[in-house]
């Protein structure tokens, strides 16, 4: 099992499928508004497209097109884990995820924050030290109106 949440990973789906034909990819989907606001708030200094709203929307559009292509081409390759569903029902969602990965589930899957051996150097470093929380759901709704003029041309932004 390998975990990497680099924002550019979707570019390598073809290579991953070719090198590791049995690989499983977990595509964590989040409300696009929440993802875009998170990118803007976290100042991703080394990510060139993350500093301009139009570039962020274009990048997301490319991401959705590429993910959808691979999901249609290889139905058992990519699992969509809806972030908000996972926050609301972590046990059932983690069971489905583990089943997709052909792994057995146990309660420790929900107790990841108790582990001392997990290392993270990302904006999520605090999140892995705490239980799953729901306070980020809908907190970005007040910004939706500001982003509508950019997102209206994309069917994934609603």
Can you say where each PLM-predicted feature lies in the sequence?
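Glycine-rich phosphate-binding loop used to anchor ATP phosphates in small-molecule kinases
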Residues: 1-17
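Generic beta-strand/beta-sheet core signal
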Residues: 4-6, 26-29, 81
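Conserved phosphate-donor/acceptor-positioning beta-strand/loop module used by diverse small-molecule
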Residues: 16-41
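Short, flexible loop/turn elements at secondary-structure junctions
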Residues: 7-8, 32, 85-87
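Short, well-structured alpha-helical interface segments that form or flank functional binding sites
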Residues: 11, 31, 92
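PAPS-dependent sulfotransferases, especially Golgi type II membrane carbohydrate sulfotransferases
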Residues: 1, 36-80, 87-158
